[in-house]
Structures are given as C-alpha cells and as structure tokens.
Amino acid sequence: NRIEFEHDLAADWARFQFLKQIWADTPKWATLAGNPLWTNALRMLGQFLLRQRVEAETAWDVALGVAGATNHELAVDILLDALCLDPDAERFLTERVDLLLGNEEKHFTRLLLRFHHIATMPSSAGLRLGTALDLYMEAQYRSIVFGRWPPVLRFLIAQRERLAGRVSSALAKVIETWLTKTPQTLGAGDRMPFRRELAEMALAMARTVQVEKGHGVMYLTREPLLYTAPLAGAADLPTEVGNWALELAGRREVDAEVKRRIAEVQVQKAKEHAERLKVDAEYKARHERRERIPASLGSFRERFPPWPLGASGKVDMDFRTACIKENGIQFLMRAQPALAGEVLLALTIEDQPEREYGSSRLEVDLGLEYTRDAYPTAFWKSPFFPFLQLAPETALASLLALVNFCTDRWAAEVMRERTGEVPGVTLQFADGSQKTFMGRRQVFGWPQSNDSMRNGSLFCSLDALERWLTQRLDSGEDISAEVEKLFREGNSAALVSVLVNVAKFRPSLLTGPLAALLTFPNLFQWDSARVEQIGYNFIALSWSRDGQAMFDFAR
C-alpha cells in the first residue's frame, strides 16, 4: 500500500532555488548541465530566464548566446527544452522565430530533436531483450506525452509559410510521430487536431525534395523520414499523398507544378552557366575539356521498355527505402490498398530492365529489383506479410501478379535456347479440368530458397503467403476461397509449392480444396528432397550480423 514516484520534486525545487542565486553567471550554472540530477532544475531556470529582462533582451536570450559562445552545448539544449516545456511556449517560440530559423536553422533543428525526445516516452518498457536491443527499442518505439505537443504544433503550423520550401528531417520526424501516434478522430468523431495541417506540411516538404532532385540536387545521406512523414498522412490526404506516391513509384506523370518548379530552376541554371562561360576563362576551359571526353562504351547492354507492372523510369532509392525497409507503405495499405498494391509492385520489379550481352549469370533473371535486406529468406521481411493481414484480397491479387510475372520471366529465359512447351506441373481438378503451372523443381523450390540475393524479395513474399495461410488455419478460418484463387489465377509451380507446405501443415485439406495436389506425385518427391536439404537454408553468418536476439528468433 504505497505510491512510488519517479521524480523528486523537493530536490528539484531546492536545486532551482540555488540556481536562481547564480542565474546571471551562465558559465557557472552551464557546467551543471552534464549532471542528470540537475536537468529538471535547469529547465525551470530556463523558464525563469524567459521572464527576466536584461536591457532589450530576456535573460534567456543572453544565456543562449553565452552558452553557445563558450561551447556549452548541453546548456543550449536545456534552454531549448525550457522553451518547449513552458506553459506559454507558443508565444515564446513565436517571439524567437527569427533566431530559430537563422544560421541555417541550427537552433530550429536542435529544438525539434530535443522536443521530440522530451515529448515522447519509451513504449517498449519491460521487454528485456538485452541491453543493446533494449536501448534501440527505447529510442525507436516511443509514445507521445500528449499535453506537451499542442503549443509547439500550433507554432509550427502558424509558421508554415516561412517553412515552405525548407527541408528538415527533424521537422519530418515530429510530424511523422504525431501522425502515427494519434488516431484520426477523437471519441466523439471529431477530427484529431493538427493532423491534416501537418500532413500538408510533410507533403509540401516532400514535393520540395522532389523538385530539388529533379534539377540535380544530390542528397548525400539517406533521409527516409522525408518520405515516411507524408506517407503517414495517407489517411488525411488520400488523393494528394496517393498521387505523389504514384509519381515517385513511376506509375503516374510528374505533377505539373513540380515540373514547372524544376523547369524554372533549370532555366536559371542555364542562364548562369551561359554568363559564366562568357566571363570565366578557366570555367570555360574545364567545360570544353569535359565536352571532349568520349562517352564510355561500357558493356554491351540492351535496354528494354518498362515492365507493365513496373515503374516507367528510375525510382528514387530513398522512396523505395522508406516504403519497404521503413514500412512506410503500410500507411498506403490501410488508406488505399489498391494503390498500395500498384506502388509495391513497381518498387519490387526492376525499374530499368536491361540485358547485358557476353555476361554469364549463375541465376535466372526474374526481373526484380535487388533488395539487400531480403536475404536470407524470412516471411517478416516481405511487405506482403502485413499487406495480407491489412487488406487480404488486394494483397493476394498483387502477390499473384508478382509471382506470375517472375514465372513468366523464368519461362522466357529457360525457353530462349530450347523449343517446345514450357516445363510445368499439371494438376487435375475435381471437375475433370487440368491446368499446368509453369516450372519444375527449381521454381518449386522458390518458397524456401536461399540461393539468390537478387530474387530474395520474391522468396520472402512466397514465404509470407505460406505463413499467412497457416496462421489463418491456426485461427480456425476457412482458406478454401484463397486456395481456389491461387489455383485459378496462378501460373507458377512456386504457388503449388506453397500449397504443398500448407497441406503438410493441415493434411485434412488433401481430401478437400487441396486434393488436386495428389494428382502429380512428383511434387512430394521434390518436397522430400527439399526437406533433406532444409538444414542448409539457415544462413548462420548472415543472421549473426543482426545480433543474438534475431539469430535465435530466425533459428
């Protein structure tokens, strides 16, 4: 029968009283910023300084300048914390907007990073996954402290005109957190405050990135937050975010306004280039030398037209990373499943198909984009696994389209140097009909294959399909409709392989929807050989790089 507090208000108050005695001596109290016991008291001091005048400024502004000049970075952080935590934060922030946005937004960026930390708290407490993993979970998975957000968000939204055209990962992080950690509506059905406005700001920032990359700006570091933030607003701005995602996935013409902004910059650059050629002899000489360099012959390659399900051109790698690795596409899956399926296929299939003559490949080119994180094969690595749970019908149709596409590519490669029919698996159904699924033992082995790093996204997707079907069986659900769809619309022996594993998981299905599998006995011979080799599918070296917890989970 006791109450335990995780703070010590009395001690914080006592320390604050001491700090008020030395508030004018910034270097003296700044040395205490490295001691966590003094953090709360120093934040109170910062709020106290906001209300003390020193000639034309407040003591807070003076202290910030002194702390910055003397390289007391922790003291600067504490003062920024005080600004965010103050009951009158919106007014104080607005009064200092020029300070925050000046000097290349140094203080603005730091303020947003500090705010994100103090306005959130770990949501993974008590997992006990190991010291390093616990720290990672605490940093990555956080829930918001709701009361601390409204003043800062009102300030950001009020300054949206001044922030237009700026690109800030710190701002994107704040926006993404609010959009992902709050519901769309409140209990009475009213719209959650700030969601739509922040989604518009995130999308405007993403459009600026699109313009900058369109006229040649290169981002030297990966910035997935600039893409996941607008994706998180897919439910708030379904049309606008959907169109933007289709553009970046190469499935829609670039927005007319974006084209105009890119052309405007290009015209200005061309003018500057022409003027510099006239007045700068050294610049002109360098330009002429570059013009005389012959184009590289390179290897003999034939570029193919874009695949019907793929992108129409080069896809932004940061957008692909944000969607696949950072799970940003899940926002589209919830808001617009059909559009998400189209984008997912475009990101999975290679965006610039080509064939290199004279080269020898150890694996068949299935027309997929190389995805480093899809090796070794595991169902949870595929975006189709959550897609199948969020929007089963749309996800299954998209997955079927992917498997059929890859199988068609396999057949085209195999039949390039042979004649006759494509080898396959012929099944007989209860109504007397027959159907041949392309591929023999190699294609049959795709769902549990680890022999290709380039085609890992396909293998993980097939593994995700198998896992989803077995989970539904475990939950007592009927999968007859899904099995019928796979038989009816699929063209690949890889899908038959998945269903063989499902039949092994629930043998009673062989007397019902999976009875057709018994009409091709070789399937079970191939499966027996696959089981004998299954021990080699665990790639210990690769899993060990992800840490002990992931190694044990994969094993």
Language-model segments: what does each one mean?
Residues 442, 446, 476-481:
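Repeat-mediated protein-protein interaction surfaces in helical alpha-solenoids
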Residues 2-27, 41:
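Short capping/hinge segments at domain boundaries that bridge a core fold to an adjacent linker or tail
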